[in-house]
Amino acid sequence: MKKIVFTGGGSAGHVTPNLAIIPYLKEDNWDISYIGSHQGIEKTIIEKEDIPYYSIASGKLRRYFDLKNIKDPFLVMKGVMDAYVRIRKLKPDVIFSKGGFVSVPVVIGGWLNRVPVLLHESDMTPGLANKIALRFASKIFVTFEEAAKHLPKEKVIYTGSPVREEVLKGNREKALAFLGFSRKKPVITIMGGSLGAKKINETVREALPELLRKYQIVHLCGKGNLDDSLQNKEGYRQFEYVHGELPDILAITDFVISRAGSNAIFEFLTLQKPMLLIPLSKFASRGDQILNAESFERQGYASVLYEEDVTVNSLIKHVEELSHNNEAYNTALKKYNGKEAIQTIIHHISEA
């Protein structure tokens, strides 16, 4: 039986692509383990999947000054030792890393044990963890073809993003019943990320009188961002977040308004949903969402509205543009084959 160790954490985006790959390896009888941090979100997610989980010390990799930067290099070194010992005991055939600060000690620990390491990078440019890990890896899978120019050519394999199988199995009838919607108007699903997005939430709600004339709205507004005055608004349903219902909601969705995190937008792409992307500004991120959104716009998958340009009028104008050019967007979206990503990655895992 072949063995694999997965790693990646710090945010859900460094875990969910692993979840898309794991079921296929289970079918092929791989022995699967996961190494992550003691208290990261990856621990909560993976333990629900009935996969052996091993914790190591980890320090965050920061690009800015913080007093914790004095302590964290020692935590990283401790993490490398923890990972080295754990990997020596597990004896995996390959390590697959999705990035995030916890992955660096695992990648180095694998390299010290002479275990082949494969990386996956979701964004257009590599994050700090993958930049460090790359020198210890044999291959790096990229989600965007344009990402190759930022990486060593001999290590890059373009795959696209692995998408969880359950996302593709939504039921429209269940969504209609859950939301209380009709078939008479198209549905827009609005997602501002797990914490919501204040400006998006406020602008959407200001635009509701105009939007609800033509559309039904599902608004995933983030924790603590519900508006009680809108709870019974016809054609408008708001949730802090949804879990098992999301595939059904996406099945009934005609257009998506969203941030431009890579994992989410590739799910929309695989589902062939035209998108209005409002990326995080450079003031709130390293600018990766802007690059992601602009790539999708160039390929005809999405329209981009920059956060500093978000107003009621600009939002309505972009939604109308999506609707008016729906056929052109759908033609472009149909050219993408999302299922190839998982098969390509599994092939290289098996060959490692």
Swiss-Prot record:
<keyword id="KW-0808">Transferase</keyword>
<dbReference type="GO" id="GO:0008360">
    <property type="term" value="P:regulation of cell shape"/>
</dbReference>
<dbReference type="InterPro" id="IPR006009">
    <property type="entry name" value="GlcNAc_MurG"/>
</dbReference>
<comment type="pathway">
    <text>Cell wall biogenesis; peptidoglycan biosynthesis.</text>
</comment>
<dbReference type="GO" id="GO:0005886">
    <property type="term" value="C:plasma membrane"/>
</dbReference>
<feature type="binding site">
    <location>
        <begin position="11"/>
        <end position="13"/>
    </location>
    <ligand>
        <name>UDP-N-acetyl-alpha-D-glucosamine</name>
    </ligand>
</feature>
<dbReference type="GO" id="GO:0051301">
    <property type="term" value="P:cell division"/>
</dbReference>
<keyword id="KW-0328">Glycosyltransferase</keyword>
<dbReference type="GO" id="GO:0005975">
    <property type="term" value="P:carbohydrate metabolic process"/>
</dbReference>
<dbReference type="Pfam" id="PF03033">
    <property type="entry name" value="Glyco_transf_28"/>
</dbReference>
<dbReference type="InterPro" id="IPR004276">
    <property type="entry name" value="GlycoTrans_28_N"/>
</dbReference>
<keyword id="KW-0133">Cell shape</keyword>
<feature type="binding site">
    <location>
        <position position="164"/>
    </location>
    <ligand>
        <name>UDP-N-acetyl-alpha-D-glucosamine</name>
    </ligand>
</feature>
<keyword id="KW-0573">Peptidoglycan synthesis</keyword>
<keyword id="KW-1003">Cell membrane</keyword>
<comment type="function">
    <text>Cell wall formation. Catalyzes the transfer of a GlcNAc subunit on undecaprenyl-pyrophosphoryl-MurNAc-pentapeptide (lipid intermediate I) to form undecaprenyl-pyrophosphoryl-MurNAc-(pentapeptide)GlcNAc (lipid intermediate II).</text>
</comment>
<dbReference type="GO" id="GO:0051991">
    <property type="term" value="F:UDP-N-acetyl-D-glucosamine:N-acetylmuramoyl-L-alanyl-D-glutamyl-meso-2,6-diaminopimelyl-D-alanyl-D-alanine-diphosphoundecaprenol 4-beta-N-acetylglucosaminlytransferase activity"/>
</dbReference>
<dbReference type="Pfam" id="PF04101">
    <property type="entry name" value="Glyco_tran_28_C"/>
</dbReference>
<feature type="binding site">
    <location>
        <position position="194"/>
    </location>
    <ligand>
        <name>UDP-N-acetyl-alpha-D-glucosamine</name>
    </ligand>
</feature>
<keyword id="KW-0961">Cell wall biogenesis/degradation</keyword>
<dbReference type="InterPro" id="IPR007235">
    <property type="entry name" value="Glyco_trans_28_C"/>
</dbReference>
<protein>
    <recommendedName>
        <fullName>UDP-N-acetylglucosamine--N-acetylmuramyl-(pentapeptide) pyrophosphoryl-undecaprenol N-acetylglucosamine transferase 3</fullName>
        <ecNumber>2.4.1.227</ecNumber>
    </recommendedName>
</protein>
<dbReference type="GO" id="GO:0071555">
    <property type="term" value="P:cell wall organization"/>
</dbReference>
<dbReference type="GO" id="GO:0050511">
    <property type="term" value="F:undecaprenyldiphospho-muramoylpentapeptide beta-N-acetylglucosaminyltransferase activity"/>
</dbReference>
<keyword id="KW-0472">Membrane</keyword>
<dbReference type="GO" id="GO:0030259">
    <property type="term" value="P:lipid glycosylation"/>
</dbReference>
<feature type="binding site">
    <location>
        <position position="289"/>
    </location>
    <ligand>
        <name>UDP-N-acetyl-alpha-D-glucosamine</name>
    </ligand>
</feature>
<keyword id="KW-0131">Cell cycle</keyword>
<keyword id="KW-0132">Cell division</keyword>
<dbReference type="GO" id="GO:0009252">
    <property type="term" value="P:peptidoglycan biosynthetic process"/>
</dbReference>
<comment type="similarity">
    <text>Belongs to the glycosyltransferase 28 family. MurG subfamily.</text>
</comment>
